């Protein structure tokens, strides 16, 4: 893998960097004072005169401002508000506060150069530069600037460098939350709260008295935010969770003691975490692992470490890594990635004094989660020894839009002569029994726990499936735990009482041999029930029907990531399976044949063809690298990165949750049940989407330096590879 790219730092006025973050760039008075170019008043009067002439429909005599043909360190002297209005009225022809390839403006705007004190002019041309100008001026306006001196380098910046920089300097910060006094109003906001009074609320587990005291004091100190603080009972049942659905709230996560820089006093501070973005404003399970891959590349190690510790807190107090940290997710988990996440953080901090203790805590938490959640009833299938997504729970999932299940529930509420709301209330609290509906929601909850909500692969069967994804992840848990106990803890890990579940006893010693045996048993079961030699891929296994499924899913490549495939199986997968999933923009979630026909009665599902998701890409790249399929990993990474970069360049800096990897022009447009997160910004995108941000940063480590240069010039993969072949053939012919 190539080294992490560094943004080029170019000296500008007063030695500030051209590529400073927006806050630094736009709050510097010194940077935006045109003292080097002459008196400021003269510039204002000239621009004022020009504005009057333009409003009167008069043209300025050419002699007053010749075009600037120089191209070294060019900077523009811009009056923010009038220029922004001119830009929008001229170039944003569809009025959506974005400048894209779909707008029909002239695609050119003339700006005054700062070096000439506004006398000379220069044309800003093309969608990319104009949309960057819109973004920069939107930010300048938000920071209260009336006039700016804007570096041209921020407008024509290499798109790979620009997006990488925005992710590193802006998007991660915009997505970071702490559940404490500094930002609880932001962290508590829940776009999925459909109740009549969506006030901020936090649920604190029974065994966290310091947190309970902290939040009660916070509520008393800030009565205006109306924070409701609730202590959870010792035992949390599905019935209890249904009972609090009308009062949804955040779940407390870990806190740490820090020193207040102003007072020097020790205070409680929430451990930070990254949220996915859009309507997902809480700590999510597998999203966090994917995000950590990018955070670690960007040297945000403390943030990734904090997320691991937050997960350890969740396992200790809630019994599992939750789907997400909201009260309505208390019975539901998500795909388990804790061991790999913790080991990646440990590799970055192993020189720190508390590194070994950090890893010990994470591995102990993973062992507890493994035994209490994944290899216990109801998720364990005792016949195969494999595990399923099969969460507890009752009633209708409350986080969905109010009418999401309308078509499912309509026959039932009509049957009982009730309104939709009346029926949901009666069904949720067990006043009405409908076994078929119970079965439907059992599978629906399982789909949501899988993280693949929704897909025809899982619909109506998920709770019965021993899926490829879950069981390869558990194999990875088993091998990670074995290796860590052997290599870090001297082949002996003592289990403290707080981590004991099931048959585990306080003081019990875990050795690598125990976990090696578990992984070998799981591999045998995976090969027996999930591997299909003829198809050259892994399939889910239906534990109710006792047969292998035939839906072709991209999760087959998780076996490479986890290392459960033999070298022979890996080679067969690359030959037979990979061509079925590879598309213009990377890997498809599933094949078109497996998805089946789509129509009014059978709409698209977002985890099916033709959509591609960041987790599937990253796990496949890593898995292919693991088995030395470097060329394939680089090719897939390039396609994904090119698609993201092209959409970013053509559509005003857009970065979204998922993509249609079959659409070359507008892959961010998704026609599925939940739409797409990351689209609804005005002027400038400020957060992207968590795991797509990570996939971009991580993917740049996968491709080689030559590919990175081609990516910066927006060269499609086929064009890039043809140019390489032509150059190679030319070189060979010259040698003859």
Swiss-Prot record:
Changing residue 394 to A: In strain: Guyane 11. One of its GO terms (biological process) is ascospore formation. Its EC number is 3.2.1.28. Substrate binds at residues 279, 286-287, 323, 332-334, 399, 448, 451. It is found in: Cytoplasm. The active site is at 453 (proton donor/acceptor), 657 (proton donor/acceptor). This is Cytosolic neutral trehalase. It comes from Pyricularia oryzae (strain 70-15 / ATCC MYA-4617 / FGSC 8958).
